Regions:
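Regulatory alphaC helix of protein kinase catalytic domains
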Residues: 53, 57-58
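Short beta-strand micro-motifs within the conserved protein kinase catalytic domain, predominantly
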Residues: 70-83
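Conserved catalytic-loop aspartate of Hanks-type protein kinases
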Residues: 197
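Protein kinase glycine-rich loop
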Residues: 12-19, 23
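Activation segment signature within eukaryotic-like protein kinase domains
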Residues: 117-118
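Glycine-rich ATP phosphate-binding loop
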Residues: 22-44
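Conserved short submotifs of the Hanks-type protein kinase catalytic core
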Residues: 80-94
Length: 330
């Protein structure tokens, strides 16, 4: 059974490697579609780390959104204690790679692109925070967890640290995430909610504009003190006051004063992009419908032509038979 499942895919190349496994580009044999699989050795993990894997699989399986990395399948090899999580392939890498390229070339990312990325990550977060079965906290939003597909559309991924909160429970406890992007309440190991994701997204946007994290330090204690103070410089002056204000709002030290996904979605720069996207999606659906109708019309036309051809053939046959009858009768 395992061999049958594994034989559905052909490994192409290694993308990355970590402590517990690797990520490889693969090809689905049935249709040639390029995907990735995350190969993890759960035999080396403690119970907490195993829980992170189960959490990622369960959350990805339930989340269906154009700005969230799509989950396809999972294969478990109990003999070698490995799990293969099969997901969408994002060929243009992640935002950390984009930031590095911009730093090397001494070029800033245009404000329009920043707003586009902002809108798409926010759309993904909206799907998480407003999930019908309970809020899903990502808990590790950072540039390297935001991927780009072939058309530079944003895909939020790596839900290994995610946690679902029931509608009755509004807060989580535990120190998780990447230190540079952790919220003050996470640093202090206090209770936190979905507003921690908003802080982390604000940090990502700051880094996209400034090409460096908002808080930098040589040790964890110094970094923690800077994050808790929450003092950051303005983003480069080439960017608008509007964008700067929104980023600073997202990075408010008091989580109760930070915006929600709903607050951010109602901002003019965001709402207009969401509307434009909905119009494009509606147009794309309409075009598919039109193409289907056109295809059906063409098939009907082909059938009509075929019927006419057969009728003509039958008429000619009938005419020939009549002529033969007349000859024999004479």
């Amino acid at each position: 059974m395992l061999k049958i499942e594994m034989d559905k895919y052909e490994p192409i190349s290694l993308i990355g490697k970590g402590n517990f496994g690797s990520i490889s580009k693969i090809r689905r044999i049935s249709d040639g579609k390029i995907l990735v699989w995350k190969e993890l050795d759960y035999g080396k993990m403690d119970e907490k780390e195993k829980h992170h894997i189960v959490s990622e699989v369960n959350i990805l399986r339930d989340l269906h959104h154009p700005n969230i990395v799509k989950y396809y399948d999972r294969i478990i090899d109990k003999k070698s204690t490995k799990i293969y999580i099969i997901m969408e392939y994002c060929p243009r890498g992640d935002l950390s790679q984009l930031i590095k390229r911009c730093k090397r070339s001494h070029e800033y990312i245009s404000e329009d692109v920043i707003w586009k990325i902002f809108t798409q990550v926010l759309s993904a977060l909206y799907a998480c925070h407003m999930h019908k079965e309970g809020k899903i906290l990502h808990r590790d939003i950072k540039p390297s967890n935001v991927f780009l597909d072939n058309e530079n559309n944003v895909k939020l991924g790596d839900f290994g640290l995610s946690r679902m909160l029931s509608n009755e429970s509004n807060f989580a406890y535990s120190n998780v995430g990447t230190p540079y992007y952790m919220s003050p309440e996470q640093i202090d190991e206090n209770r936190y909610n979905e507003k921690s994701d908003i802080w982390s997204l604000g940090c990502c946007l700051y880094e996209l504009t400034s090409l460096r994290p908002p808080f930098e330090a040589t040790n964890h204690l110094s970094l923690a003190l800077k994050i808790k103070a929450g003092k950051v410089q303005r983003i480069p002056v080439k960017y608008s006051d509007e964008l700067n204000r929104v980023i600073m709002w997202m990075m408010t030290v008091n989580q109760d004063s930070r915006p929600s996904v709903e607050n951010l979605a109602s901002l003019p720069q965001i709402s207009i992009r969401i509307k434009e996207r909905k119009i494009k999606e509606s147009y794309a659906k309409l075009k598919i419908l039109e193409d289907n109708i056109r295809g059906r019309e063409e098939r009907v036309k082909e059938k009509e032509i075929e019927l006419e051809r057969r009728e003509k053939y039958l008429d000619e046959r009938e005419k020939m038979l009549k002529e033969k009858e007349e000859i024999f009768n004479n």
